Amino acid sequence: MEGGAAASTPAALPYYVAFSQLLGLTLVAMTGAWLGLYRGGIAWESDLQFNAHPLCMVIGLIFLQGDALLVYRVFRNEAKRTTKVLHGLLHIFALVIALVGLVAVFDYHRKEGYADLYSLHSWCGILVFVLYFVQWLVGFSFFLFPGASFSLRSRYRPQHIFFGATIFLLSVGTALLGLKEALLFKLRDKYSAFEPEGVLANVLGLLLACFGGAVLYILTRADWKRPSQAEEQALSMDFKTLTEGDSPGSQ
């Protein structure tokens, strides 16, 4: 890069990222296998519409959200604006897919005459979706929309990082609640008899937890954070000077 050599990538980081992706892709594939083998598959205009809900939520609020959080670790030496745009786009895709999953479950309940929003899973799910949408909206306003000042972005950034990790953790927990609810609703007493579907779903739950743990571990390693590039620091100082009247040497 111009203005200085690119920072080297920590030796172990690519292996942890690759492992997280292996877990995530296996998670998505196993979710599809569970729905195909034991739940009849997915179809929008039938009683299989409900099955779109778990698949969409796993793809959107687990896999894509996790990958969006890892963007700043994976693309450590790319242009900051490019990384921001990719981070935001992955979150948009996750949000849209999750919205499809929400529509599927509410529409299915309406057609079948089931009550809505009575379980802990549903309450947590709505909370996660609302928080995720607000997080994306505020993040866009602060970091992609050009109106926010540098000092305002700097003050908000720690909150953005904290709530991003928290919402992801809540998403994993909510998915685990939903998985258990789906198993108990269908299998009931047979669940304790080690039914094949129950065993497969238990493995799916372990994959959910492991993927969440892998993503959070990568995020919390301070030595794996994206290093500040020289030109980014210069642009930040220039922007602050223009918007607040400070001099670059006032820090």
Swiss-Prot record:
Reaction(s) catalysed (UniProt annotation): monodehydro-L-ascorbate radical(out) + L-ascorbate(in) = monodehydro-L-ascorbate radical(in) + L-ascorbate(out)
Co-factor requirement: heme b
UniProt topology in membrane: Multi-pass membrane protein
This protein's GO CC annotations: chromaffin granule membrane; lysosomal membrane
Residue numbers on the Cytoplasmic membrane side: 1-16, 73-85, 146-158, 220-251
Start and end residues of each Cytochrome b561 domain: 19-220
Parts of the chain on the Vesicular side: 38-51, 107-124, 180-198
Annotated positions of the N-acetylmethionine modification: M1
GO MF terms held by the record: metal ion binding; transmembrane monodehydroascorbate reductase activity
PANTHER family reported in the protein's UniProt record: CYTOCHROME B561-RELATED, TRANSMEMBRANE ASCORBATE-DEPENDENT REDUCTASE CYB561
Name under which the protein is recorded: Transmembrane ascorbate-dependent reductase CYB561
Organism listed in the record: Pongo abelii
Gene: CYB561
